[in-house]
Amino acid sequence: KQLVMCYEFIDDVFEGYYYFYGEDEDFDEQVWADYGYNVVDYVFWHEVGHAFIDIYELPITGLEEDVADQFAALMLSYTYDSETGSYTLGQTMLYDVGTWYYNENLYWSEIYPAETGEEYVPLYWDVHSLDIQRFYNITCYAYGSDPEYNQHLVNTEDLPEDRAIDCEYEYFMIEYGWEYLLGGVDNGFFD
């Protein structure tokens, strides 16, 4: 078994960011590169989550895509920044992933129809949650992992207060759930 990350996908991530921000006066190529890396890193961990579920035959409830999203968010939240001595790098990575989902939703729901004259119909039946739902979920997990650091997400209304109330518990349950599921697997993740 193997994980495959397609060059076309990676290219789409970078092109998508450039589509939204490439003409900005303060466009920063390093921010662009970091964004692309962070989204690709997230997708890698998302696929690792699928692999763990498959290889170790982990019992899950709910959509596997959501569970894999949760695993990826958890792994990013554990990213330690040795320069600052904190986990703020992981928070930035999660913000970039949230931005990616937000922009994907914006493109398909508003920009694509305006540019093509074709109506976009969300795939409500798909195994993936809608991009806008994934945006709010990722934002919630970021907030829940460190509410004090991420209070600005609520203050700027990127995360509604009604959702933020339960985010710390949601994050705890994700962390606890994955620790439990992988507890019998000698992988070193939760040692």
Model regions: which residues?
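Charge-dense, low-complexity polyampholytic segments
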Residues: 81-111
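Flexible coil/linker segments and helix-coil junctions enriched in charged and small residues
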Residues: 22-28, 84-86, 113-117
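Pan-zinc metallopeptidase signature
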Residues: 115-191
